[in-house]
Amino acid sequence: MTSLLVHTYPSLVKGILIKRYKRFFADIQLDNGELITAHCANTGPMTDVCVEGQPVYLSRSDNPKRKLAYTWEMIQLGETWVGVNTNLPNQVVKNALLQGVFPDLVKNETEVRSEVAYGQNNGSRIDFLLTHGDNSLTYIEVKNTTWNQGETALFPDTVTTRGQKHLQELMALLPAAEAIMLYFINRGDCYRFAPGDSKDTKYGQLLRQAVAKGVKVLPCRFQVTPTGIYYLGLAELQL
């Protein structure tokens, strides 16, 4: 399919990653030689992505209340830019839903809501709840995916009890509603998607169980560039 622009970055600042530490902080040397500390929104291990000495791009906020003006947006690995700002995928997916990028999901008179309470005693929040014109419901959970092995994107890159819980909750929605797990592949060099069994065996087992029960999996490919993010279509699902 033709790539579709789904997010435009503001003017970004280029630098080199010196180090990432305490999960939230990244020291960056800007192209002008200045050494700054940027906010890292990704609190996970960033397996094989957090490579010191690689080119990065940062966004800059003019909000005087922020302790760190810069946010780390992406890193270059080989010829590929990889998105590392985990605050973006849900925003991008919502815009894509509203723009009709996923026509099979958003039909006429579909209402799109974010962060809706659901699950046992409404103790969880689904990333997106779609209410269609016929009152049918579609629940969508989004997972950011940056770890790869060759041309295969993998999730998770560490043990995630939270992710396991999300799969169980999606299964519990069936058959009364449609349940979707959307993997946001935040790099353009992956054409396949598979569960990261070597990092979390139970998650892989639950994902296969969920698919067998009727949970739909959408491994969505995105190309990240210094100017914007493009939707490339679906990756091949390998279970």
From Swiss-Prot:
It comes from the Bacteria. One of its GO terms (molecular function) is DNA binding. CDD domains: SfsA-like_bacterial (cd22359). InterPro entries: SfsA, SfsA_C, SfsA_N. Signal peptide: none annotated. Belongs to the SfsA family. NCBIfam families: sfsA. PANTHER family: SUGAR FERMENTATION STIMULATION PROTEIN A. This is Sugar fermentation stimulation protein homolog.
